Regions:
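Short, charged/polar, Gly/Pro-enriched secondary-structure boundary elements
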Residues: 50-54, 64, 121-124
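Core segments of cupin and vicinal oxygen chelate
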Residues: 2, 9-54
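Vicinal oxygen chelate
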Residues: 90-151
């Protein structure tokens, strides 16, 4: 059996507020909002394209959470979203409270990236893919071509 990424899980002092930010910022949908037997509020949000669930929860009963860290660091460092226009998306996310950390950065292959600090000190990457006729044709046909992270 091939392994498939099932979800990403974010911890937040206010899970509903954080989930609503991702709804506005990236078109997530809130599918579940419950208090689990662990005592934490648990919200399930699939991404706009349905490719991955992002679970957002608070601390469990008796659990103390350390601070978030939006800086570059070891371990799970960020998650990325495709962008059709980097500057437009950066400006839109900043109006929602995100803060630009790095970029836009031009890669030698033509793609551009930027990193932002999202709620709860989560590091988010925006990726504006290189414009090319073959990539446009593939996208129109429903395919996404990625060459070595293409940045």
């Amino acid at each position: 059996m091939a392994f498939r990424i099932n979800h990403t899980h974010l911890k937040s002092p206010d899970p509903r507020k954080t989930a609503e930010w991702y709804v506005q910022a990236f078109g997530f949908t809130i599918l579940g909002d419950e208090t689990r037997v662990f005592g934490d509020r648990f919200i399930r949000c699939p991404s706009e394209d349905g490719g991955m669930d992002v679970n957002i929860s608070g601390a469990r009963t008796g659990e103390t959470l350390g601070p978030g860290d939006a800086s570059a660091h070891h371990g799970l460092e960020h998650f990325g979203f495709d962008s059709e226009h980097l500057e437009t998306d950066i400006a839109r996310l900043e109006t929602l409270g995100a803060r630009l950390l790095e970029g836009p950065i031009q890669s030698p292959t033509g793609s551009r990236i930027a990193f932002l600090k999202a709620p709860d000190d989560v590091r988010v990457e925006l990726i504006e893919w290189r414009k090319s006729p073959w990539r446009a044709a593939a996208a129109e046909a429903g395919y996404r071509i990625v060459l070595n992270h293409d940045q």
